[in-house]
Regions:
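A short acidic, Gly/Pro-enriched loop at the edge of an enzyme's catalytic core
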Residues: 128-138
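Glycine-rich phosphate/adenylate-binding loop and adjacent beta-alpha elements
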Residues: 1-35
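Short loop/helix-cap segments at secondary-structure boundaries that form the rim of catalytic
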Residues: 112-117, 130-132, 163
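Glycine-rich, N-terminal phosphate-binding loop of Rossmann-like dinucleotide-binding domains
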Residues: 142
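Glycine-rich phosphate-binding loop and adjacent beta-alpha segment
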Residues: 145-166
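Short, acidic/turn-prone active-site loops that include or flank metal/cofactor-
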Residues: 107, 125-130, 165-166
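Mid-domain Rossmann-like dinucleotide-binding core that forms the NAD(H)/NADP(H) cofactor-binding site
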Residues: 42-125
Length: 166
């Protein structure tokens, strides 16, 4: 039923001590409902990005359902310019029509990569241009204590924070 609420749940490669090996183990036991067969039309070089794309799409759809304004009219901050942050940004801008978005990351190379694909302002998080109480929606794709605090500072009163990173 609600496995995600179980106090004794075990997550692949995530529990300490590790009780269940992760995805790089030689063999892994996974419940049937968690296995998806990839379509034959999906190329092998595209398959690895299916999971992060699904995670990003799910997060964007959660934000869309939870917030009263449309995504295209919302001011959005994405904390983290890695795979999930970039994919979330792509879905927000290319699919949902979000016009005002900012991506923050410590890594200059990631910010440059994001700016190639997104029409979004890219900044390091210590920049004075990251505004407090400014954003309708904040996506934290990093999941560290410091990024949680950045999200709390950046979101407007009444805005929402979507925590994606673990």
């Amino acid at each position: 039923g609600n496995e995600h609420l179980c106090g004794k749940r075990i997550i692949l490669g995530m529990n300490k001590p590790i009780e269940r090996q992760g995805g790089f183990a030689e063999y892994v036991s996974i419940p049937d409902q968690n296995i998806y067969e990839l379509p034959k039309t999906l190329e092998m070089k595209e398959a690895p990005i299916a999971e992060p794309t699904a995670v990003s799409l799910h997060a964007v759809e959660l934000a869309e359902k939870a917030y009263y304004k449309s995504l295209k009219d919302s001011k959005v901050l994405v904390i983290g310019g890695g795979a999930i942050g970039l994919l979330s940004g792509l879905i927000l801008s290319k699919v949902k029509g979000c016009k005002e978005m900012m991506i923050v990351d410590l890594n200059e190379k990631r910010l440059k990569e994001c700016s190639k694909y997104l029409d979004a302002q890219t900044l390091k998080p210590d920049s004075k241009n990251v505004m407090n109480d400014h954003f309708d929606i904040v996506f934290d794709t990093v999941g560290m204590e410091v990024t949680r605090q950045q999200a709390i500072k950046a979101v407007k009163p009444g805005g929402i924070i979507i925590h994606i990173g673990l």
